[in-house]
């Protein structure tokens, strides 16, 4: 065994041993709802990206960073990438150009504004809530939808002026309203996992799903350079 494979085994051996456990006994098995089977054909690279979807406040950032650390992947936040390219905060993009323009930016990012492999992508809560977006995300990698109860979401995000859709008098009611509208898209987008358990257990559950739906992650290959992301021009 060469040095690279031996080093990978030392670092991640226990992780993949856990992933080989019987998936029927996964901690969240009772909460798991499967969308149509994830596409695993030859269009995927050997180490496809993991896309974390779901409403704001469901743990995409904390889960995503732990996943990336465990796999040795790069963590990317779609909102942060859009903010960097536009030199504007999300709330300002909404205020100046509107939600439809922001959703165009999200589509551009998913379509080619990031590396094609070796990444964990935390996606904005409404990213898949446009026609064709669930299918686009699933064509790029392994899609996981995180979900939580509305009261848990509100408790996690608190008062955050960076959440333009929740700057209303009754944010809890707004969360329920948005979840009802988005759930059909979420259900079409990937495996759904509740994030009401320990972070470590949630990450292990996702790792099992990832291994089951991809080529062996141990067969790593060099990361690809990110494609330059150019946001579309706003209509005047």
Model-derived features with residue positions:
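NTP-dependent small-molecule kinase module
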Residues: 2-23, 41-45, 66, 70, ...
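Hydrophobic anchor at the beta1->P-loop junction of P-loop NTPases
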Residues: 52
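P-loop (Walker A) phosphate-binding loop of NTP-binding proteins
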Residues: 55
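Walker A/P-loop
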Residues: 61
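ATP-dependent small-molecule kinase phosphotransfer cores
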Residues: 77-127, 131-138, 163
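Short glycine-rich anion-binding loops that position phosphate/pyrophosphate groups of nucleotides
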Residues: 125-127, 149-151, 198
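A glycine- and Lys/Arg-enriched "phosphate-lid" helix/loop adjacent to the NTP-binding pocket
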Residues: 140-184
């Amino acid at each position: 065994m060469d040095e690279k494979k031996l080093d990978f085994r030392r670092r991640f051996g226990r992780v993949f041993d856990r992933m080989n456990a019987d998936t029927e006994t996964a901690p969240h098995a009772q909460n798991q709802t499967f969308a149509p089977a994830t596409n695993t054909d030859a269009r995927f690279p050997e180490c496809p990206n993991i896309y974390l979807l779901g409403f704001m406040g469901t743990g995409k950032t904390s889960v995503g960073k732990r996943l990336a650390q465990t796999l040795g992947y790069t963590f990317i936040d779609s909102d942060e990438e859009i903010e960097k390219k536009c030199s504007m905060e999300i709330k300002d993009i909404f205020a100046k150009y509107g939600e439809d323009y922001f959703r165009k930016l999200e589509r551009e990012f998913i379509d080619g504004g990031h590396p094609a492999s070796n990444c964990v992508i935390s996606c904005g809560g409404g990213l898949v809530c446009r026609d064709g977006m669930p299918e686009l995300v699933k064509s790029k990698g392994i899609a996981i939808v995180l979900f939580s109860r509305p009261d848990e979401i509100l408790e996690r995000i608190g008062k955050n002026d960076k959440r333009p859709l929740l700057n209303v008098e009754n944010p809890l009611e707004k969360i329920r309203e948005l979840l009802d509208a988005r759930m059909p898209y979420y259900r079409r987008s990937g495996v759904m996992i509740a994030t009401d358990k320990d972070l470590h257990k949630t990450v292990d559950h996702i790792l099992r799903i990832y291994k089951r739906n991809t080529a062996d992650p141990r067969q790593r290959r060099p990361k690809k350079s990110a494609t330059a992301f150019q946001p579309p021009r706003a209509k005047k």
